[in-house]
Every structure is written in structure tokens, then in C-alpha cells.
Amino acid sequence: SVGSPNEWYSRQARQLIQQRAAAGQDLTKAALKLMNTYRLTSSTPTALRAMWTLNAIGSADEDWLLEQSNDEREHIRTWSIKLLCDQEALSEKTQKRFIEMGAQDKAGLVQLQLASALQQLPLEDRWPLANALVSQDTFAKDPVFPLLVWYGINPAVTENRNAALKLVAQCKIPKVRQFIARRLAGEAGKE
């Protein structure tokens, strides 16, 4: 069973369910059981295993994953972001939820996952999420977070200088401000 405390059994169950899904078998009962396991467990690892399996068999749609982005457990919220990003292009409602989370969620893993999601957005759509992420200085000294934000907005900086300048004006992460200023100055020198 996916809910087994023994990781080997759980992994074998997930693999078998995924193989059946790939073979086109009807997994309605399995999906219901997985959903039940997800809802009833107090174990975060078990909930994640159920979530991953539901996603692998196509039973974790956008609406369900967006609901999970409100879960009290940081790892569940983080994985809901990751799985939403693994789907097709991010919808407007998913982007809005990411912006809300960027501004309000204080969990480090969630913030890192959102910063990494920047790279999956079209250039013009990156600014609202980037603004939300840099509006607080909680992770300013983190060795990874400022770089992830920068990697996400770097290609957009020269495409929209005004948005970049607005971001610099309200940015509370010195390293991101420095990178943007350096990039804009470098581009200005080429003109």
C-alpha cells in the first residue's frame, strides 16, 4: 500500500499503480483510495506519497493542487507548487495564487519553490510574482533564494526596464537589487 510506513512497499505500490495507469487500466478505485489515504493520514510522508501517485496517474488536477497550496504543512504546499509547475502552462488563477503565496507564506521551502517557478512563466508574467517574493527580507541572507529570484527575472530585466526599476525600488533583498542594477548599467553601456 502507498500508505505503508515501509518505504520499499510504498514505492512498489506506487510503481505498480503507475504502470497500470500507463497501460490504460481504469484506476478510479485506486484514485479514491489514494485520495482517502491523503485526507486521513497525519503523516506528511504518507500524504506526499499519495499526492505524488495521484499526480502520476492524472488524478491531481489544477483545482485540487491549488487547494493543497493552502495546507498547513510546508512540504505539501511546496509540492503543490512543484506539481502545478509540472503541468502545462500556468493558468491565471495559479499565477494569482503563487503571487499570494509569495507575499504571505513565510515558509522557506515554499518561497524557494516559488522563486524557482519564476523561470516557467512568460517574461512579462514574472514581475508580479518577483515583486511579491522580494517584498520581504526574511530570506535576504539565504545563500540560494536571492539567486533563484535573480535567475528567474534576469532574462526579463532588459525586456522591461520600467518593471525592473520598479522592482528595484521596492526590493528588500540587497543582492537582487545589486544584480538588477548591474545588469541595467551593463545594458546602458552598450547603447
What are these language model-derived features?
Residues 1-191:
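Long, ordered, helix-rich scaffold segments
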